[in-house]
Amino acid sequence: MAIAENYEDVLKGKYPAKAHAKKVAEWIIAKGGDKNGTIYLEAQKQKLNEDNDGEAPFRQRRYFFYLSGCELPDSYLTYEIATEKLTLFIPPVEPDEVIWSGLPMSPEDAKAKYDIDHCLTTKDVNAHLTSTSESAQSTIYAIPEQVSDHVTFISYKEKEFKQLKPAIEYCRVTKSDYEIALIRKANMISTAAHEAVMKAASTAKNECELEAVFLKACVERNAKNQAYHSIVAAGEHAATLHYVHNAAPISDQNLLLLDAGCEVDCYASDITRTFPLKGKFTAESLAIYKIVLDMQHQCINALKEGVVWDSVHELAHKVAIKGLLELGILKGDAEEIFTKRISVAFFPHGLGHYLGMDTHDTGGNANYADKDVMFRYLRTRGSLPERSVITVEPGVYFCRFIIEPYLKDEEKKKYIDESVLERYWSVGGVRIEDNVLVTKNGFENLTPTPKEIDDITKLILST
């Protein structure tokens, strides 16, 4: 059976906060940290919108959530490394707030819900910190600028602000069964939303209508937060990688690119599908779609523990070059085109990134200053560990802003046939993106959203 395949059963348990805390502590100790230290983290504070009394949208601080599983704002936690005790501090009852919002979660309720040893109120935090520092503990680990002014570490011998954040970022790369279950659930809900958009596409008059269809499908499944701003791009708008206007009329455009995903309990999905709005590809859009689908299939099939992501990214470019040569858009020697980075004109972004609590999750070690343009925007570098989740999102785009400088360059333009290229501008762009779990000997694709040509066209035409 696949890992966390029955995700609803897995999610009946508690989020594994203590296992995460122990994992982080072990990383700190392995780097020479204090085995008698204490970890301290704070939740995001509830804030008001500027110049009015309305609450700003709340997004839990991911570092805090990773060691608590707690979605409550204005909370704190401590983890005593030697005793492995995890203590959560939640806001006390404020009578004025109860009038408006009802009774908050009690410490008893929190103890039952979360994977913690103790739960106190935030009023108790300084007394608790003093008591732990007076025992064997000597070092407090925290994240700079994420400690409230009234919280004091004065009784600790050492205050360490450099190790905790990278420790959590490293540990977040490899996922527990519970985390994989959350990502699976987010993918299932987002798949239903993508399918709803495909079914509604043929009658839509504006991109915003289809964005609304996606959001409705998520919210009615109790996924009220999106992992990122949806991209709903018809026709040539899809040539813009992060097009977010989602408000243009839909008329005679052939393709729609939908890059959208909900989150479930702070864990993201990130799915892209490109499909013909009326259910039928043009010859040009079909040719490009087949290239991108081949890019994705080959790259996913290359995944397993230890594979070097840079090499998989190179594979995507080589598949793209082969396909564009066959269409006549590119001309010349494939190896020469690869070496001179001509394919970057059509595939300018990285193949994918780690996925977890953030859409672009931690631990990727990107190098945005890389002088090699092929790798500059590759958000994940190096080898992929078992239980990491990576997006695989190849694309081919016809963006005038990106391609035209190549056409004006005497050395580069000889590899591009402008007369053939002219037929493809209207395609805009094609991207296909799945969320893939890396396993010891291969992979598990967590994204069941239709993408094969027959599957998507039948779905669109079924309405």
Curated annotation (Swiss-Prot):
Q: Name one GO biological process term.
A: proteolysis
Q: Which domain of life is it from?
A: Eukaryota
Name the record gives this protein: Probable Xaa-Pro aminopeptidase pepP
Q: Which Pfam families match?
A: AMP_N, Peptidase_M24
- Which organism is this entry from? Pyrenophora teres f. teres (strain 0-1)
Give the enzyme's main class according to its UniProt record, as a single word. Answer: hydrolase
- List the residue ranges forming a coiled coil, or say none: none
What InterPro entries does this protein's entry cite? Aminopep_P_N, Creatin/AminoP/Spt16_N, Creatinase/aminopeptidase-like, Pept_M24, X-Pro_dipept-like
Q: Which cofactor does it need?
A: Mn(2+)
Query: Which terms are listed as keywords in the entry?
Result: Aminopeptidase, Hydrolase, Manganese, Metal-binding, Metalloprotease, Protease
Q: How is the cofactor bound?
A: Binds 2 manganese ions per subunit.
Enzyme Commission number(s) of this protein:
3.4.11.9
Q: Could you tell me what this protein does?
A: Catalyzes the removal of a penultimate prolyl residue from the N-termini of peptides.
What reaction is this protein's catalytic activity?
A: Release of any N-terminal amino acid, including proline, that is linked to proline, even from a dipeptide or tripeptide
Ribosomal protein as a keyword of this entry, yes or no, is: no
Which residues participate in Mn(2+) 2 binding? D259, D270, E433
* Ligand binding (Mn(2+) 1): D270, E393, E433
Task: Enumerate the SUPFAM superfamilies for this protein.
Answer: Creatinase/aminopeptidase (SSF55920), Creatinase/prolidase N-terminal domain (SSF53092)
Its ancestry begins with: Eukaryota, Fungi, Dikarya, Ascomycota, Pezizomycotina
Please report which protein family the annotation says this sequence is part of: Belongs to the peptidase M24B family.
Query: Do you know which Gene3D superfamilies this protein is assigned to?
Result: Creatinase/methionine aminopeptidase superfamily (3.90.230.10), Creatinase/prolidase N-terminal domain (3.40.350.10)
- Single annotated GO MF: manganese ion binding
